[in-house]
């Protein structure tokens, strides 16, 4: 099992912190365990409340069912069903920018 460094950033929320996240744990769950409050609703990859945008690195979000191909290509990620697959940087609180 690999453990990756996931940097979570959101200027509007004053958030810029790096967490450690195993490659078999969702980013949202790891953030919560480390005391970081991120938005979420369904926790199943079926809505957009937890949306973020990967600006560096890669994630595996094969469990998601909400984002379309264009949103995926643009780097959007649902943190509730995303595993890190490298060290990465994720802009959080991106639900509004999806639309």
From Swiss-Prot:
A GO molecular function held by the record: electron transfer activity
GO BP terms: electron transport chain
Residue intervals of the 2Fe-2S ferredoxin-type domain: 4-96
Binding residues annotated for [2Fe-2S] cluster, in chain numbering: 42, 47, 50, 80
Annotated InterPro entries: 2Fe-2S_ferredoxin-like_sf, 2Fe-2S_ferredoxin-type, 2Fe2S_fd_BS, Beta-grasp_dom_sf, Fd_pln
Locations listed in the record: Plastid, Cyanelle
Cofactor(s) required for function per UniProt: [2Fe-2S] cluster
GO cellular component: cyanelle
Keyword annotations from UniProtKB, A to Z: 2Fe-2S, Cyanelle, Electron transport, Iron, Iron-sulfur, Metal-binding, Plastid, Transport
Iron-sulfur in keyword set: yes
Entry's cofactor comment: Binds 1 [2Fe-2S] cluster.
Purpose of the protein: Ferredoxins are iron-sulfur proteins that transfer electrons in a wide variety of metabolic reactions.
UniProt subunit comment: Forms a complex with heterodimeric ferredoxin-thioredoxin reductase (FTR) and thioredoxin.
UniProt cross-references to NCBIfam families, sorted A to Z: fdx_plant
Family (UniProt): Belongs to the 2Fe2S plant-type ferredoxin family.
Name of protein: Ferredoxin-1
Protein's organism: Cyanophora paradoxa
Lineage: Eukaryota, Glaucocystophyceae, Cyanophoraceae, Cyanophora
């Amino acid at each position: 099992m690999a453990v990756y460094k996931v940097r979570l950033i959101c200027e509007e929320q004053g958030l810029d912190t790096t967490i450690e996240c195993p490659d078999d744990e969702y980013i949202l769950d790891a953030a919560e365990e480390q005391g970081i409050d991120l938005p979420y609703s369904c926790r199943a990859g079926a809505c957009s409340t937890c949306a973020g945008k990967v600006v560096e690195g890669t994630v595996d979000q094969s469990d998601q069912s909400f984002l379309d191909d264009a949103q995926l290509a643009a780097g959007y990620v649902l943190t509730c069903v995303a595993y890190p697959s490298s060290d990465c940087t994720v802009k959080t609180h991106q639900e509004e920018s999806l639309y």
